């Protein structure tokens, strides 16, 4: 049986916290920011916790 591999795309997009939660970056803050209000870009700052149902699938991809 070959070694299980981590999904490389998922490993770039998700991170696990110390408590075991999976976090992600918020969308819509990469480019074309000129016309977006500053309040919106601030709101999109930081990380967001992945929803429970999605977290199960993401965990499977990260553990390999």
Curated annotation (Swiss-Prot):
Disulfide bonds: none annotated. Keywords: Ribonucleoprotein, Ribosomal protein. Residues 34-46 have a biased composition (Basic and acidic residues). GO terms for biological process: translation. Residues 1-47 are annotated as: Disordered. Belongs to the bacterial ribosomal protein bL35 family. This is Large ribosomal subunit protein bL35. It comes from Mycobacteroides abscessus (strain ATCC 19977 / DSM 44196 / CCUG 20993 / CIP 104536 / JCM 13569 / NCTC 13031 / TMC 1543 / L948).
């Amino acid at each position: 049986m070959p070694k299980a591999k981590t999904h490389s795309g998922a490993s770039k997009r998700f991170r696990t916290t110390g408590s075991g939660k999976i976090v992600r970056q918020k969308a819509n803050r990469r480019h074309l920011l000129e016309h977006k209000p500053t309040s919106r870009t601030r709101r999109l700052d930081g990380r967001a916790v992945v929803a429970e149902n999605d977290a199960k699938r993401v965990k499977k991809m990260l553990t390999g």
